[in-house]
Amino acid sequence: MRRGLISRSKAELPDAVLDTRLARVRAAMDAAGLDAFLLYTNNTRAAGVSWLTGFVPYWSEALLVVPRDREPVLVAALSYRVKSWIERTSRLAEVIHGPRIGFEAASMIAARKADATVGIADLDGLAAGIVEDLRRGGPRLSLSDATALFAPLRAEADPAEVALAMRAAAIAQHALAQTPGRGASLGESIAAIEAQARTDGAEEVYVAAAPDLDRDRRLRRIEGEAALGESFALRATVAYKGTWIRLTRTFPRDGAVHPQEAAVARLAAAVAKLPSSDGFADFRPGWSRAAGSRSRSSR
């Protein structure tokens, strides 16, 4: 369940952007001969529906129905009491509520064309119960997987999507910078990261940790307290208006910043162990063999 603020900003996601995306989907539908296109969403799989409508569910699940000749309709398992909230935070022609979203979506499509051709993104990943309800709600509907139709449309991000990703990254970066430092426990560091991310507008934030990098570099969710090694890592996974970003930083337990020279020395030692047939043995920190001149390291 998402616990942060879910809102819509027309400045960040204008109607014109959604119109352009929808037009691209409809053009692909026409080329594939589809009468309708379905996208599934829940609080962990919000990206596709959010990309077309701006809608991000805080809980439960829904199906977005995109007819070839009408505006998108959301069939949601959320109760009717959140109808006005859904309408405020997304751009939809209509919201239909019902516990059996597959049956409701299929019935709506079949009412206009009983033998409609329906493409479904990630059909194999759709719950069996929803697929069965789609067949019950529209026995004559022709259902097929349309993942290959939808995926290329999102392969290249538009400026609005890039801007949302940059905002999410800024939230994650700012949050990771709030770790208390010397003497702080792991729990205090995680709490500081989560608090800052939510203050900055994150819809959701998950923090994972590798408490002792010398022993185990795997990042995991921490329950309770864990002893810190000489260095540890924290990863912030942040959602902002349907866009997810994940950033990881490593930290020394004592709060000191390790000199860049130490990192360069470790790199040089590692490179010295490589085969020298291509000249690796001649590597010296701060020098570029290919350029034949001294190069400055970027900070």
What are the roles of these predicted feature ranges?
Residues 1-299:
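Active-site neighborhoods and metal-handling regions in enzymes and metal-associated proteins
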